[in-house]
Amino acid sequence: DAQGVAHELSCIIAERLGWAEMETDVTWAGRTHDAFEWSPGVDCRISAAHNEESLNHDLRAIEGQRHVLLLGMTQKHDLQSTLAPFANTSNFVRAVVTEAHGGRNPSVPPQELARELAELGYVEVEISPDPTMAMDRAVRLAGEFDCGVYVTGSIYLVGELLGEFVRREGLDLWSALTIHPLGARTEG
């Protein structure tokens, strides 16, 4: 699984850099199906999956769990193929589509994502171009349907939502993401 791979990779990097070995859980935001508490009582999971292979993998990992889908993506060479994994799942009670800002490619317009999901059989698709407002809407829907929220489609979308979460909670993003603070002793 992704968390095991991330842990192995961090151990290899630590060894090569001469860091003392330490037992720790590895969290890679957007890659390890991390839950984050955007709203108390609603399970919100984030995934940076953005291509057919990674979406297939991640959708298999949540098979049998009900969610509201929050989807935002940057432009793809073949959007239909990228979204194909969503045709093979019944996990989602609703979908909210939004924009994903950042990177070298522009966002897929939410109207286009909504059209593509409709062609895959999604009846209830809402459009909310602002990612924060889209997440708030997805959380409200999840409360109505007593299920979770699954955010996917872009590392930029994940980053934007994590940034907003940090801002809302008054957290320090730099501290939260720092593994080895400057000046920290890393050798035994």
Can you describe what each PLM-predicted range is?
Residues 39, 100-104, 170-188:
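Short, flexible loop segments at boundaries between secondary-structure elements
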Residues 1-94:
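Nucleotide phosphate-binding/pyrophosphate-handling subdomain across enzymes
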Residues 67-69, 92-97, 169-178:
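Short hydrophobic/aromatic-enriched beta-strand-loop microsegments
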Residues 41-44, 83-148:
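C-terminal helical cap/extension that packs against the catalytic core
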Residues 62, 90, 142, 165-169:
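Active-site catalytic pocket residues across diverse enzymes, especially alpha/beta-hydrolases
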Residues 154:
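Active-site-proximal loop/hinge segments that shape catalytic or ion-binding/gating pockets
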